[in-house]
Amino acid sequence: MPRLVNGREAAPTYSNLVGFIFIFNLIVGTGALTLPGVFARAGWMLSLIVIVLLAIISYMTVTFIIEAMACANAIRNWQTLQALRQSRSSAENSENDDNADDVSLASGAEQVGDFERVPLTIQNREFHYYQLSHKFELGEMATLFFNEFGRVMFYLCLIVYLYGDLSIYSAAVARSLRDVVCDQTNGTDTNNLMYWPGDFENNTSLACWKEHTISRLNMYRVLLIGFTLIFGPFVYFNVQKTKYLQMLTAAFRWMAFTLMICISLKLLISRGAKGHPATFNVYGIPSLFGACVYSFMCHHSLPSLLAPIRHKSMVSKILSIDYIIICAFYILLAMTGIFAFERIEDLYTLDFLPYDVAYVDFWSGLLICIDYFLALFPIFTLSTSFPIVAITLKNNLQSLFLDMSQYESYSVILRLCFPLLAIIPPFCITYFTESLSSLVAFTGTYAGTGIQYIIPVFLVYFARRTCSELLGSGVVNRFKSPFKSSAWLVFVFIWSILCVCLVSINLFS
């Protein structure tokens, strides 16, 4: 018997185009900036094959999330209908009371209101049981369909992913600031690039400025401490990414991506290919797999974007178009970069720093401004996202370890510990490593595989089984995944396990 789902008001709706844009912006993020580097390391042909294959499998598991969410709505509607039937039965049994007329009128009014909120009829039950009108987050679906062990494993997987997310954000901001502040000639040192993963050790001896003794590593750590001290305290407050901030961030993001692609194409046309990446390089698979999984990650936030879409029947089509365009965009961004530049930084924006460029006229000055905008672009976007992700992590830690229904009964000291638990581990990780490729590889391969592959498989499996027991097989789920055979579930599960094993062997051998 599933847990009772509380009713909630429906969210405001938006058009299919707005939903398309929101989902597009959700998927395309920091991971895209790491793709050129991993493409260069793994080889262009191998990278093409892997990213297309992972895009298809990621879309497959997204359809599992949609189906599971529709099943959660069906269970909610079923529970509400049972409650209405019990209410009607109780009203009929109370007809012999002294206030039978008043009770019947009040009960009838309540039933009318409940039926208005749940448009469920016997004649049209196949259409109304399965909906996407009410938002069910992954945590709610895990609580609904999983047992206690499954719920704990879900939260652990999500928490590890969010820790990785914060570590990537911190390292990306600190590295971007360091490479902008320090002498740019040192920024091109081959020991600090994707091809040489030992950059952390070399930055210990490389000076940030020729006339000073502070090393690039120490400058990175100073900037990391400053970033954490400035944005870390926001985790104690209820900070939200407003619509206007989201629109501004999206505008900056697309301006930056467009400029990067245009500059790379211009360099390819004007001076030819400077980069000569390999065709296949199996040693680049760990970073490639992790970055691709990380770049297609949207599953943990997708339900909140699906519920407000006005025409729910178009959800699958919107997502399929999103995935096709995003995959093509990733390939264009990475392929132009690996052939336009001789060497690729693991954060692609750092390849656009104005090395040895002098200001001589308006156009050279404009080019320098564009280069600095691209180099500083991750700092703005990730700084605005850092507090939101940290607050999400804090809330999930509290949900895992505390009884949120009795939250106010816990001591203030205990409640103040959770924001620190959200901030300190990512800081410690990035203090001792600045390798974005390693952070992305680990986060995408392990926690990302759990959230993007394994959790959707188990969610849709238990959702199908629960709905079959409650509603029977005669009620059709119009949001059912096109990959409805159980063989697809087995395939995705085996695929994810094999990938994690192979990546682990390559990563630690």
UniProtKB/Swiss-Prot annotation:
Segments on the Cytoplasmic side according to the record's topology features: 1-19, 67-151, 240-248, 299-320, 383-411, 461-487
A single GO cellular-component term on record: membrane
Glycosylation sites: 186, 202-203
Keyword Lyase in annotation: no
Superkingdom to which the source organism belongs: Eukaryota
UniProt keyword annotations, A-Z: Glycoprotein, Membrane, Transmembrane, Transmembrane helix
Record protein name field: Transmembrane protein 104 homolog
Taxonomic source organism: Drosophila melanogaster (Fruit fly)
